[in-house]
Amino acid sequence: VHDHLWRSSHVGFVELADFMTELCKKLRGSTGGHTLHCHSDPMLLSADHAIPLGLLINELVTNAVKYAYPEGNGEIEVSAREVDVHLQVEVSDHGAGLPEGFDIDQPRASLGFKVVMGMVRQLQGDLTIASDRKGSRFLLDLPILSRPDESNLA
């Protein structure tokens, strides 16, 4: 994030597509034989959002690598797009799905999911989880609370 802030022509903002490309490049180094696909719409995102968003994506991809494909390797997809005044980020796989009866709000939920929910709260977003035997889908919807000052755009 710091590198992207330094390179950005908009103080305090990062280009989301570049940030996601770099994040996914680094994540691919720890995915073993899994295939990681990443895509993002081009948009500017405040550093206040980029840092927790990067941590959240890292945690969800790490969980997919650990648990989604117990029988071998598979695909994990990360996408980000702007919808109205919201950023929607999706992390999905086609693996085993979450354990039956899994409730992210229960105390027995993993530390990783507690980190995820902490980041969701920090981002003032909503997280929707869909899971079955064909995989899991985590959809984060967060408001875009700040934009760069239009008078400073080059």
Can you annotate each of these PLM segments?
Residues H4, H10-G29, R81:
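Short beta-to-alpha transition helix within the HATPase_c
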Residues E75, G97, D132-L139:
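Glycine-rich nucleotide-binding loop
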Residues L87-F113:
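Glycine-rich/acidic phosphate-handling loop/turn and adjacent ATP-lid/helix
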Residues V120-R121:
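Detector for a conserved hydrophobic position within an alpha-helical segment of the HATPase_c
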Residues Q124-D132:
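Glycine-rich ATP-binding loops of the HATPase_c
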